[in-house]
Amino acid sequence: MAATRLWHRTGRLLEIASAFGPWPGVYSTSPAFAEVLRMPQKQLRKVVYPLRELEQHLVTDSRPGLIEQRLFDPSLEDIGRAESVFAATVRNRIEYLSSAVRLDHAPSLRQPEVCFIGRSNVGKSSLIKALFSMAPDVEVRISKKPGHTKKMNFFKVGKHFTLVDMPGYGYRAPEDFVDMVETYLKERNNLKRTFLLVDSVVGITKLDNIAIEMCEEFALPYVMILTKIDKSSKGYLLKQVLQIQEFVNTQTQGCFPQLFPISAVTYSGVHLLKCFIADITGSLK
C-alpha cells in the first residue's frame, strides 16, 4: 500500500509533465525521468536543478559564492543514466538486506556504501522512499511519529552500492544511538559519503551541530541535504539556503560545499541527488 501511494504521488507529477513536448537531444533509460524531461525548461529546472531555480531570485549585489551550484552540475543525459542505477530490474536487484543495532551485526559487503543521518522527523525515510520510487518492492517504512527508525537499515542497490538508513537523533532516539553511529562512522571502511539531512524550514539546530561536529572530528566527507523545501516560500527558502551555505563555507572542513535542496513530495532535487550518489559510488562507469 505504501508503494502504491508513492507511485500515485509520482504519477501526479508525471501527469503534469506529459502535457508538454519532449526535451530535444536527451535520452533516458528511465521512463519516469523521460516524462520529467517533457516539462518546459523553467519547470524542469525547478525539479532537476533546484539551486539554479533559486539563483534566479538572487539580487545582483548578493555576495558571490554563497550558492556553489557548479561544483556538481551534471548534464541531463548523465542524470538520465543515473536513473537506471535506481531502477529495479532482473539484473539490477534493489532490496532490503538487514537491520543491525551494532556494527558487528551489520552485513559485510565490499561494495561502496553511503549512509543517511538526521534528526528525528527530518524526512529521512521519506527521502529514501523517493530515491527508491522505481523499486516498488522495497519497503521503506514511514511513520508520523518521530524516532521511528531504531536500527541501521541496509539496502542493496544492485552491484553498485549499499544505502544505510541510520536512526534519527534527538527525540525518541535509541539509547545506544551515539555508540552505534560513532562506531559505524569511524570503522566502516567502505563508507564513501555521509549524507546529513537538515530541515530547510527549521535550519541547523543544536542537534544538527552535534552531528556536524562528529563528522568533522572523524574527518569524514559528508554532504548536507536540505529537506522539505516544498513547505516554504521561495523567499524564505532562499534566505535559509544562503544562511546554511555561509555556515558550510565558513564553519566546516569536510562538508561538500554544494547543498542539495530536496522535496520528497514534488521530487525536486531527487534526480540530481541520485546522480550524485551514482557518481561518488562509481556507478556511472
Swiss-Prot record:
Q: Which organism is it from?
A: Rattus norvegicus (Rat)
Residue positions binding GTP: 118-125, 147-151, 165-168, 227-230, 262-264
User: Which residues participate in Mg(2+) binding?
Assistant: 125, 149
Task: Note the Pfam families from the entry.
Answer: MMR_HSR1
Please give the family membership noted in the entry: Belongs to the TRAFAC class TrmE-Era-EngA-EngB-Septin-like GTPase superfamily. EngB GTPase family.
Q: Which UniProt keywords apply?
A: GTP-binding, Magnesium, Metal-binding, Nucleotide-binding
Instruction: Give a GO cellular-component term.
Output: mitochondrion
Q: Which part of the chain is the EngB-type G domain?
A: 110-283
> What are the recorded GO MF terms, alphabetically?
GTP binding; metal ion binding
Cofactor(s) needed, names only, are: Mg(2+)
**At the top level of its lineage, which domain of life is listed?**
Eukaryota
Annotated InterPro entries: EngB_GTPase (IPR052279), G_ENGB_dom (IPR030393), GTP-bd (IPR006073), GTP-bd_ribosome_bio_YsxC (IPR019987), P-loop_NTPase (IPR027417)
The name this protein goes by in its record:
GTP-binding protein 8
